[in-house]
Amino acid sequence: MTWILKKYFLKQYFQKRVSQGKVDIPYVEIVLTTKCTLRCESCNNLMQYFSAKNQYTCTLEGILESLNCLLENVESIQRLRIIGGEPLMFKDLPQLVHAIEKRHKIRAFDIATNGTIVPKDELLRAFKDSKRFRKVSISDYSSAPNLKIPLQQETLFKKLKEYGIDYSFLTGGIWYKVEKIYKRNRTKEGVIKNFLACQMPCVSLMSGDRGKDEARENGHIFVCPIASSLSKLKGIEEFSGDYITLEKGDLRDKILNFYAQDFFKACDYCQDYSKPRVDIPAAIQTDAVLQVEDRD
């Protein structure tokens, strides 16, 4: 009941702010990399579709440029989550944490990890010194049937306790099965229906970083991490109208229109979310890199 009331009053708060011409973002995830220590067959962020040839990893400069552009157009980001792939693989993470701490429009932030990497002391100190860093969110994959690398949960818990850093441990060990990703060719009404049935509340930001020797483009905001991953796998041109380009100028109307939108082309690539979901053990591994299929 407490969460329902909180959700209700937050909705009323954001509606009131919009009526006053204010733009507040409740929650956004920044994707640092599609590289991961695991290759989970039903990863809902589509990391199992990335190979060494098409991986995305932002630069510190690129992700901050995109984040700064967003912050120039909003009053606040209530909560920001750092994700991957596995975000602890991002070499400039301590510097990013310090940079986020200096951006006062970001009210709180945290990070999600799969528990296979123990953070270095430099990063732990950055977490500890931050006044707005809330926690490390650790997934529990101890019941996964075929992990290829060892989990570092106990060592991770010990280090976080040593530094006095809050963390949560997401126990349960059950996911739902994610079907293969491909364009279903639904009607516009069918795509909207699938979006409304899904309602994944995870707006996703990716920088415009490309290859090592290629010029950086503008970053973008997507409706979810599936959409942001698809923009890299299929090419962003495929999804025109689905995203906000983080470019110079006033983006406030575009941001408000984005949040009011109910048609996203990326939703046509997902399974039918109106049907019952099939429970499976968390983090089942696949040896093969999956492919986004082309079907008639």
Residue ranges and their predicted role:
Residues E65, C69, T155-K158, E162, ...:
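Charged/polar, solvent-exposed surface patches and flexible loops
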Residues K53, L64-E65, R103-K105, R132-K135, ...:
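Short, surface-exposed linear patches
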Residues I25, L60-I63, L93, I149-Q153, ...:
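A structural signal for well-ordered alpha-helical scaffolds and beta->alpha junctions
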Residues K6-D24, F169-K180, S229-D253:
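Short, charged low-complexity linear segments at domain edges
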Residues F90-A227, K232:
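Conserved AdoMet/S-adenosylmethionine-binding subsite of the radical SAM
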Residues T2-T113, V118-R125, D129-S130, D296:
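Conserved alpha-helical substructure of the radical SAM core
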Residues Q48, H98-I100, F127-D129, E154, ...:
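Generic alpha-helical propensity signal that fires on short helical segments
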Residues K183-D296:
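Accessory C-terminal segments flanking Radical SAM cores
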